[in-house]
Each structure stands twice: as C-alpha cells, then as structure tokens.
C-alpha cells in the first residue's frame, strides 16, 4: 500500500543578525515580511535581545561579558562567539544558505560575525555576508576595526557585500536625519537579502533553483548589489539601468564579475519582452565568461512597478571560469495557483516609481573592498 509522501525540497534559508547593527537590520527585515526565511539575532547584549522583535535569539559570551555587551572591542566579540560555538552550530544546522548581517566597527558584529561564518562554512552551508562600514564621523579607530573585521570575514564566506555608510550619506544628502541614514543602510541590507532569497522562495514565471544560486555565489569573494524600481512603458529598461548604475561603479570594471544573479519582481502583468529587455541590459555589461542567472518573482502589490535586483559576484578575481549557461525552468503549475498554494502574504512595497539616477563623482579605488551598488530606491531619497 502506498502512503502519500510530503516533498520537502525547498531550500532552508536563515538570516543571522550579529551585534547591534546586524540585529537592527534583521528586525527591519522581519517587519518588512521577507518570506520563506528564518531569522536569528546574535548578541552579547542581553538587554538588546530582550527588546528585539526577532523571534529566535542567541546570547553569546555570557561568561565573559555578563550580558553587558562587548564594549566596542572586537576581540571580546570573537571570544564570546568562540565560547558559544555549539549554540551557533545548533542554530545553523539544517540550513542550505545563510545570510550574515552585521555592522562592522563595533565589538560584537566585528568580532563575532567571522566566527558565525566559520561555523556555517564548516557545516557546508552557502554563506553570504552583507555588512556595513561605519560613517567617517564615527572615528578612525572604529573604521580600522571595521576593515580588520571585513578582512577576517572574507576568509570564511562565499560572497561578501559591503555597504559603506559614508557613501550613503553622500547620496542621500547631508540634510538627512541620523535615524533616516541608518534606516537607509538597513534598507540596503534588506534589499540584498530579499533580492536573493525571493528568487528561491517566491513563485515566478521563470524559476531559479538553489543550485543556480550556489553556482553564482559559491566561493566568489567580493560582490556588489544594486536595485532599481520603475513604472510605465519602459519600466524594464529603466529599472535594469538603475540597478547597474551607481557612483560606486565608475572606477570598477564589472566585466570582470564571474557571476551575475538577476531577480525581476513585478505583478502578474509582467511580460516576456520585459524579461528579455532586462536580460539584454544586464548582459551588455557582463563578461561573456560570467554565469548569468535570471529569474522572476511575483508580487501583486507591485501594480505598475517593476523591480530589478542585480548581484554581481567574483569581482576583482583574476581567474575566470569557462562560459556556463544556466537554463531557467518554466513553472509547470499555473503561477497564480502556486502562489496561493504557498499561502504567501504579499510584501509591502512602498517605493515610488523612479527613473532618475543621481550621480556622484566620489573617487573609488580598485583596491577598496567596497564593490557594491547602492540601490536606486535609496538614491531616490536624495531627490
């Protein structure tokens, strides 16, 4: 007699916020209802964990810090994480992909994030870190700690996306409030996680499976991400151009990227020609040797808007792989039925359609590990 078997082939994605900055970023993601992922907050500060809206929390280093935080000392943060490696391992086990969100420069995020990444890699998990660098006004010492932390973190992750807060300040304008500035940084962190995770977790006309994502992001080093939102007749071309247009990219040769992951998010009116337009726009800057993966996800709240998220990986790496073609899988089940079957609540999208790109001539050297793109939905706030 045959028994019905429940298929459990969905990739397990976990997002770990480390320290105060990482915890705030993950809390922001929880409020924005990013679906299909599990959230954790890791901190030495017991009070911060008690106040967070993140459902699963891990206090590390209680024997060292007594729950009072790392005192802006990365060494204390690292020792705290080392003390509770077993708890971190238990939280990470079973994941196929882990995002680590952290603010570099402080004690816990800077010191503990590399340990979390090391544990994840030891478990064979695809590990991606999305971190911020401090504002210049936070001081040279904090910036030095951040640089050291990023260097250490890069040794233990598959891909590393770095967001320099000071570049955000230049784009958003000096009149922005401190609260809004940090909020913009959280939005970029959310955008990176959301853009990648939705490719796997949300239904679409062209599906990307976990193996495709692993191909683009595994062992790739420094990465950049960008996002653009537009509406109207030319929304596909405009959103794609905005996603790859950034002042940070002026001195960076993106043709050296070894992998490019593209997520097109729109309502049920998304057209095939629009997907083709986005693909052609992205391939115009990508190397012929790069692995380009394009997928779609559907969000009925987008209405007339279309969002393009691009993650380019392996930037600055000398060795390039042979050309790899990735074929997107057509969904056999009707998209609307599959969407409802998953019981997914639509995301709230508050960005307004934008077609204007703000340029910034701030110099960027090829040696700096700031290979990322500031999404257009952040740049629009400068208008």
Curated annotation (Swiss-Prot):
GO biological process, one term: FtsZ-dependent cytokinesis
Keyword Cell cycle on entry: yes
GO molecular function: GTP binding; GTPase activity
SUPFAM superfamilies: Tubulin C-terminal domain-like, Tubulin nucleotide-binding domain-like
Localization per Swiss-Prot or TrEMBL: Cytoplasm
Coiled coil: none
Binding residue positions for GTP: 20-24, 107-109, 138, 142, 186
InterPro entries: Cell_div_FtsZ, Cell_div_FtsZ_CS, FtsZ/CetZ, FtsZ_C, Tub_FtsZ_C, Tubulin/FtsZ-like_C, Tubulin/FtsZ_2-layer-sand-dom, Tubulin/FtsZ_GTPase_sf
Highest taxon in the source lineage: Bacteria
Keywords: Cell cycle, Cell division, Cytoplasm, GTP-binding, Nucleotide-binding, Septation
Gene Ontology cellular component list: cell division site; cytoplasm
Family recorded in the similarity comment: Belongs to the FtsZ family.
Protein purpose: Essential cell division protein that forms a contractile ring structure (Z ring) at the future cell division site. The regulation of the ring assembly controls the timing and the location of cell division. One of the functions of the FtsZ ring is to recruit other cell division proteins to the septum to produce a new cell wall between the dividing cells. Binds GTP and shows GTPase activity.
Subunit structure: Homodimer. Polymerizes to form a dynamic ring structure in a strictly GTP-dependent manner. Interacts directly with several other division proteins.
PANTHER family xrefs: CELL DIVISION PROTEIN FTSZ-RELATED, MITOCHONDRIAL DIVISION PROTEIN FSZA
Protein's UniProt name: Cell division protein FtsZ
Gene label: ftsZ
């Amino acid at each position: 007699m045959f028994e019905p078997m429940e298929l459990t082939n969905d990739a397990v994605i976990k997002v770990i916020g480390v320290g105060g900055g990482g915890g705030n970023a993950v809390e922001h993601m929880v409020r924005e209802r990013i679906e299909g992922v599990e959230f954790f907050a890791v901190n030495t500060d017991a009070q911060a964990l008690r106040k967070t809206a993140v459902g699963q929390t891990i206090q590390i280093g209680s024997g060292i810090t007594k729950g009072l935080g790392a005192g802006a000392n990365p060494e204390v943060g690292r020792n705290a994480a080392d003390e509770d490696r077993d708890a971190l391992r238990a939280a990470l086990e079973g994941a196929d992909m882990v995002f680590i969100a952290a603010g570099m420069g402080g004690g816990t995020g800077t010191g503990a994030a590399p340990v979390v990444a090391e544990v994840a890699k030891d478990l064979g998990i695809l590990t991606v870190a999305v971190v911020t660098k401090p504002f210049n006004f936070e001081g040279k010492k904090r910036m030095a700690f951040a640089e050291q932390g990023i260097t250490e973190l890069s040794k233990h992750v598959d891909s590393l996306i770095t967001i320099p807060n000071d570049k955000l300040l230049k784009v958003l304008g000096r009149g922005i409030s401190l609260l809004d500035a940090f909020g913009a940084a959280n939005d970029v962190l959310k955008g990176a996680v959301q853009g990648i995770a939705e490719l796997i977790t949300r239904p679409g006309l062209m599906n990307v499976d976990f193996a495709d994502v692993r191909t683009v992001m595994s062992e790739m080093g420094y990465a950049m991400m960008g996002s653009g939102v537009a509406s109207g007749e030319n929304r596909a071309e405009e959103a794609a151009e905005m996603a790859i247009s950034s002042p940070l990219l002026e001195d960076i040769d993106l043709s050296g990227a070894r992998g490019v992951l593209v997520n097109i998010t729109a309502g049920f009116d998304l057209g095939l020609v629009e997907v083709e337009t986005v693909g052609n726009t992205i391939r115009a800057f990508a190397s012929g040797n790069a692995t380009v993966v394009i997928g779609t996800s559907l969000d009925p709240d987008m209405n007339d808007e279309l969002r393009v998220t691009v993650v380019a990986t392996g930037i600055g790496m000398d060795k390039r792989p042979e050309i790899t073609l990735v074929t997107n899988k057509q969904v056999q089940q009707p998209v609307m039925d599959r969407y409802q079957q998953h019981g997914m609540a639509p995301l709230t999208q508050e960005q307004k359609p934008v077609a204007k790109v703000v340029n910034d001539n701030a110099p960027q050297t090829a040696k700096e590990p700031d290979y990322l793109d500031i999404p257009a939905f952040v740049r629009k706030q400068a208008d």
